Amino acid sequence: MKKRIPQCLLLVAVMIISGIPTFAQRKSAMLNHIALYVYNLEKSTAFYRDIIQIDTIPEPFHDGRHTWFKVAEHSHLHIISGAKEIVTHDKNSHLCFSVPSVEEFMTRLRQHHIPFESWKGEADKPTLRVDGVKQIYFTDPDGYWVEINDDHT
């Protein structure tokens, strides 16, 4: 046990000196997850897995009411079943995913008969933001708006 204490102290010192990030060093909040309350878990899971193409990750509940997706290194999307109905949402409240090619993504949406639009609501057209980023908008099975863009920053 006495040999372990110096080893642990040495490890902590090396981490501090080398600048390896730790929770104590983080100065701001970090997004952990976003949760969406959905009407049909299977349909929503298939949408985010097969259309958006994000990977599922293990969830701790194992109760048939949750699906978790990894959306970034330390950020997740949680889909939770139990909504009594599908609700209309405003486009200003949306999730956004960046992809290598908006054109290829539009082709996928067309193949799956999922309508999309520009920010102004023009059907089957992308928007070109003032900074050159191309973007489209559509809704998931529960009426949540999703933006797809080609922002590479």
Where do the model's predicted regions map?
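Bacterial Sec-dependent N-terminal signal peptides
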Residues: 1-26
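N-terminal beta-strand motif that seeds the catalytic metal site of vicinal oxygen chelate
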Residues: 23-42, 93-95
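Core segments of cupin and vicinal oxygen chelate
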Residues: 35-76
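Vicinal oxygen chelate
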Residues: 40-42, 95-142
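Exposed loop/turn and edge beta-strand positions of beta-sandwich/beta-sheet ligand-binding modules
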Residues: 63, 91, 132-133
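Mid-chain, structured segments of secreted extracytoplasmic proteins
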Residues: 66-111
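A short acidic/small-residue loop/turn micro-motif
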Residues: 152-153
